[in-house]
Amino acid sequence: MTLVDVRTPDPKRFIPGATGDWEVIVGMEVHAQVLSNSKLFSGASTEFGKPQNSNVSLVDAAMPGMLPVINEECVRQAVRTGLGLKAQINKRSLFDRKNYFYPDLPQGYQISQFKDPIVGEGKIVISLGPDRQGQFEDIEIGIERLHLEQDAGKSLHDQHATMSYVDLNRSGVALMEIVSKPDMRSSDEAKAYMTKLRSIVRYLGTCDGNMDEGSMRADVNVSVRRPGEGFGTRCEIKNVNSIRFIGQAIEYEARRQIGILEDGGTIEQETRLFDPNKGETRSMRSKEDAHDYRYFPDPDLLPLEFDDAFVSALAVDLPELPDDKKERFVRELGLSIYDASVLVSEKAIADYFEAVAAGRDGKTAANWVINDLLGALNRTGKDIEQTPVSPAQLGAIIDLIKAGTISGKIAKDLFEIVLTEGGDPAEIVDARGMKQVTDTGAIEKAVDEIIAANPDQVEKVKAKPTLAAWFVGQVMKATGGKANPQAVQALVKAKLGIEE
């Protein structure tokens, strides 16, 4: 593969060193587990968390005479992902044997794709920001390829004092290896890339994106150079399993390499591991090249071929993806780019928002979902799937505000009650006497009392009419937030002689 530099050096991304500025170059190989009930070449289950060695077929265990049979659903999922990445779909691809020895690789080789992958070049657009001016920066990250391959098993070193065990539940599970071009220039860009890629495969339903379960993990390639120079020697950081760790690994590795080069040393091409406890990378082994794996076409598998109709049928059924959904939210609902970006960041959040916004004002729904619901979930360490407030309940609260039944302040209190106790919002309002006061006589009485008790403030308002807001706040406080805010404001201004 010939590396092409498509980015113009950007001073705001330079890393200052003792002898001048440096630029970090990042590319990623992301292993995404295909969402499928069975493995790539066998009928064994892919269910996570099952007892050790319970999801293993004779094919997965590499028993003599067992032959691989391609899982068509895994092929479909790879093509769907390629379409979602706006990539070239190769209607003819080959499976190869990647030869290496490891205890949890029973075949002695991994079935992968080398020269002829199922998906070719594509792209992902990431967005950084907003900056201090509220602007976003869109950056296109190239996709080099996507290929299908088997996962290996798992070596267990903590089960016995002197022996290691092997769990083959993952052996043969289908992976999509999604290889980016070296187009990223900071840890923030790399984190945004991984976040966007995970969002896309979740929208597509081709990978669950659960990094804590190993369903998505990244090999991060890092090198540094002086701005304007050619690519430096890269080091690969293996199996980074969280977006936060990706950022930490890149920042540490870039600093490590800069330190070596500034001291007159050279960077050795190698594979490294990231230690999240120490926040540093350490050497694992020298980096292999393709010829070290002795790739050759797998003689047990025919070339994988399909036609345009196969691809077209999958393309027609693709769901609306994050970028398209964000554009629609901005165009049709009048949301800001920031709010739309937050709402489409996860499919579950977007689905929740659309359920709340159906038949209601989009901006109001967005404010409640982003500021109140997501804020509450962040405080309690829950995600959107665990929310105790359903879209119907949140929508009902918004409806009560619009109908004038409750004020905005009371709505906040009502939301907290629904969040902690559940229940129907309208019934809670009735049972707890939370309806706002719309009786102008009662409101006028409260306004008169506040004005009479604060003659000094009345004089100040005459000089500075904007201070009338203080009286509005006092009346709202006196009525327990139940008074209609618009009615209070109108009466305060009328009583104080402030013209509209």
Swiss-Prot record:
What catalytic activity is recorded? L-glutamyl-tRNA(Gln) + L-glutamine + ATP + H2O = L-glutaminyl-tRNA(Gln) + L-glutamate + ADP + phosphate + H(+); L-aspartyl-tRNA(Asn) + L-glutamine + ATP + H2O = L-asparaginyl-tRNA(Asn) + L-glutamate + ADP + phosphate + 2 H(+)
Q: Which domain of life is it from?
A: Bacteria
Looking up InterPro entries in the UniProt record yields: Asn/Gln-tRNA_amidoTrfase_suB/E, Asn/Gln-tRNA_Trfase_suB/E_cat, Asn/Gln_amidotransferase, Asn/Gln_tRNA_amidoTrase-B-like, GatB, GatB_C_1, GatB_Yqey_C_2, Gln-tRNA_amidoTrfase_suB_CS
One Pfam annotation, family name? Answer: GatB_N
One GO MF term: ATP binding
Reported function:
Allows the formation of correctly charged Asn-tRNA(Asn) or Gln-tRNA(Gln) through the transamidation of misacylated Asp-tRNA(Asn) or Glu-tRNA(Gln) in organisms which lack either or both of asparaginyl-tRNA or glutaminyl-tRNA synthetases. The reaction takes place in the presence of glutamine and ATP through an activated phospho-Asp-tRNA(Asn) or phospho-Glu-tRNA(Gln).
Q: From which source organism is this entry? A: Rhizobium leguminosarum bv. trifolii (strain WSM2304)
Report the family membership. Answer: Belongs to the GatB/GatE family. GatB subfamily.
The name of this protein is: Aspartyl/glutamyl-tRNA(Asn/Gln) amidotransferase subunit B
Q: How does it assemble?
A: Heterotrimer of A, B and C subunits.
Q: Where is the signal peptide?
A: none
Q: What is its EC number?
A: 6.3.5.-
What is one Gene Ontology biological process annotated in the Swiss-Prot or TrEMBL record? glutaminyl-tRNAGln biosynthesis via transamidation
Record key words, sorted: ATP-binding, Ligase, Nucleotide-binding, Protein biosynthesis
Supply the source organism's classification. Bacteria, Pseudomonadati, Pseudomonadota, Alphaproteobacteria, Hyphomicrobiales
Q: What gene name does this entry carry? A: gatB
Family annotation (NCBIfam families): gatB, PRK05477.1-2, PRK05477.1-4, PRK05477.1-5
